Amino acid sequence: MDIRISSEGINISPKSKLKIQKKIGTKVEKLLAHLSQDLKTGHLRIEKLKYRQYKANFEMLLPGKNGRIVAQNINHQLLTTVTGLREIIERQITKYKNLTFNPKKKTKTTTLN
């Protein structure tokens, strides 16, 4: 899983970037194991807001009609923000998989005359 991390108002050390990539990437990798590696690219943007808050935005495009994964989380601690973001991403990917690979079958009702 390739996660491109950019930041605004904060310098993120390489060690922290590695932690963030591991925290998000491992779970997303497991959920999207059926896709090829080049399709699993996400963009993570981290901003430092006023009052010591961190805002994390994540975007990822997957194949299919419902393939846009977008998540946002705000918290006072950077890693807690990333953990909350990961949970949102997990829910959205699960929803994407259910809609794409297990679509509800439309059944036709027949009327008896």
Question: Positions of the model-derived regions?
Answer:
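N-terminal, polar/charged subdomain of small-to-medium soluble alpha/beta proteins
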Residues: 1-113
